[in-house]
């Protein structure tokens, strides 16, 4: 019971620290990009050109050339201070919950591995989490801004789970497995989602400018890397004592003839 309590305490501390740091960074990097992209969510088509006489076709074409789609502010853009603060609060709460959940998984994996761990080794564990959860899935499904074209949500979620699980299994096999067949199977599991391909819409057209989308991908991966670095280092530092206790815990011995 003491082990579980300390495990949850370590996960809570690591999750709060990493979630808070990610929230601060996102307010300066990804959130402004999201707000900018939401301005492109509502697009009013340009007015249809009026049918004119053959002699007026050229002026009409020239006039229609200067009229493009009218951009309007999307409904998700906060217009008051209360709405903005509410969005910030929801972002922080989401990051904190996500941090605690991932910290529990990472701490449990450290204990199950049974290897010595500290803040430095925890940083390596955090790098593995970043690769599995953020980097590997981004090769097929990079972070998307509002207003970008996307395939069916359920298909994307299933592919993301397969890519993240495959990357995690592959790295675990490379780090701990000794059987070559196991390693080969794990590598195949890592590559399989990417060989099948991520689900994409039939048309990649979207209202968001490509340079804005590319900037968002790099900013999102950067904040995710910071999140996992803090998460792994803090988890490793706090879990180090638990792993040491588990290694030196005396095994239960049964005396001959005892019942």
Regions found by a protein language model. Name each.
Residues 1-259:
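Juxtamembrane/disordered regions of integral membrane proteins
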């Amino acid at each position: 019971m003491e082990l579980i309590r300390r495990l949850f305490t370590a996960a809570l501390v690591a999750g709060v620290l990493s979630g808070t740091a990610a929230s601060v960074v996102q307010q300066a990097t990804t959130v402004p990009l999201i707000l900018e992209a939401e301005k492109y969510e509502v697009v009013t088509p340009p007015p249809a050109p009026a049918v004119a006489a053959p002699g007026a076709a050229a002026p009409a074409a020239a006039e229609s050339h200067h009229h493009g789609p009218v951009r309007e502010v999307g409904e998700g853009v906060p217009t008051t201070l209360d709405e903005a603060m509410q969005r910030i609060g929801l972002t922080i709460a989401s990051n904190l919950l996500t941090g605690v959940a991932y910290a529990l998984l990472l701490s449990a994996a450290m204990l199950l591995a049974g290897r010595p761990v500290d803040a430095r080794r925890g940083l390596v564990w955090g790098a593995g989490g970043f690769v599995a959860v953020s980097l590997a899935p981004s090769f097929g499904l990079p972070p998307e801004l509002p207003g970008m074209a996307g395939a069916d949500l359920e298909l994307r979620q299933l592919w993301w789970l397969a890519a993240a699980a495959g990357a995690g299994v592959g790295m675990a096999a490379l780090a701990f497995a000794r059987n070559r067949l196991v390693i080969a199977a794990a590598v195949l599991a890592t590559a399989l989602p990417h060989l099948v391909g991520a689900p994409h819409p039939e048309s990649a057209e979207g209202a968001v400018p490509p340079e804005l989308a590319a900037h968002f991908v790099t900013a999102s991966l950067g904040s995710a890397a910071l999140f996992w670095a803090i998460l792994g280092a803090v988890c490793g530092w706090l879990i180090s004592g638990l792993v040491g206790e588990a290694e030196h815990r005396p095994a239960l011995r049964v005396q001959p003839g005892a019942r």
